[in-house]
UniProtKB/Swiss-Prot annotation:
Membrane protein topology class: Single-pass membrane protein
Domain of life where this protein originates: Bacteria
Cited HAMAP family: TatB
Assigned protein family: Belongs to the TatB family.
GO cellular-component term (any): TAT protein transport complex
Predominant place of localization: membrane
One example of a Gene Ontology biological process annotation: protein transport by the Tat complex
Keywords for this protein: Cell inner membrane, Cell membrane, Membrane, Protein transport, Translocation, Transmembrane, Transmembrane helix, Transport
Functional note: Part of the twin-arginine translocation (Tat) system that transports large folded proteins containing a characteristic twin-arginine motif in their signal peptide across membranes. Together with TatC, TatB is part of a receptor directly interacting with Tat signal peptides. TatB may form an oligomeric binding site that transiently accommodates folded Tat precursor proteins before their translocation.
Name of this chain's protein: Sec-independent protein translocase protein TatB
């Protein structure tokens, strides 16, 4: 793979022994061996994936060839009906794009919201209704509060309100009910 001979490998080992020493050299060799193992597995994985992709591409190409061959071997009736469908589709495209090609392409890429439209198109032919009578509110100004009100009038009105509340209190009747029975 790297085209390294035995003599080069022995030279690297001796230099490593001199630089790292006898205690750290085995740890360094294990670490380098782990890196090499990881690189080899990565290369193998990439190679397998490329092979699978190439096989898939070849399969798709052969499938397209078979489809073309089957289309060429169709009966004349099926070919005629396919040609008619193609002509109808192209005529529809031409009539649609003949109106305004630029507008047709803009319309194809536009999302329409039926709720938000112009008032002219939404209310075409509709006239607003006229009201027979128009309501109006009377113009009133608030009356000024009188500051010179005697206190006796104020207390009398409060006493009247208290008396009305007491007379409006509900009357409770004491009658035996079913819950009072033993």
């Amino acid at each position: 793979m790297f085209d390294i001979g035995f003599s080069e490998l022995l030279l690297v080992f001796v230099i490593g022994l001199i630089v790292l020493g006898p205690q750290r050299l085995p740890v360094a060799v294990k670490t380098v061996a782990g890196w090499i193992r990881a690189l080899r597995s990565l290369a193998t994985t990439v190679q397998n994936e490329l092979t699978q992709e190439l096989k898939l591409q070849e399969f798709q190409d052969s499938l397209k060839k078979v489809e073309k061959a089957s289309l060429e071997n169709l009966t004349p009736e099926l070919k005629a009906s396919m040609d008619e469908l193609r002509q109808a589709a192209e005529s529809m495209k031409r009539t649609y794009s003949a109106n305004d090609p630029e507008q047709a392409s803009d319309e194809a890429h536009t999302i329409h919201n039926p709720v938000v439209k112009g008032n002219e198109t939404q209310h075409e032919g509709v006239t607003p209704a006229a009201a027979e009578t128009q309501a109006s509110a009377p113009e009133q100004k608030p009356e000024p509060v009188k500051a010179n009100v005697p206190e006796s009038t104020e207390t009398a009105s409060v006493a009247t309100i208290d008396a009305e509340k007491k007379s409006a209190a509900p009357v409770v009747e004491s009658s035996p009910s079913s819950s009072d029975k033993p």
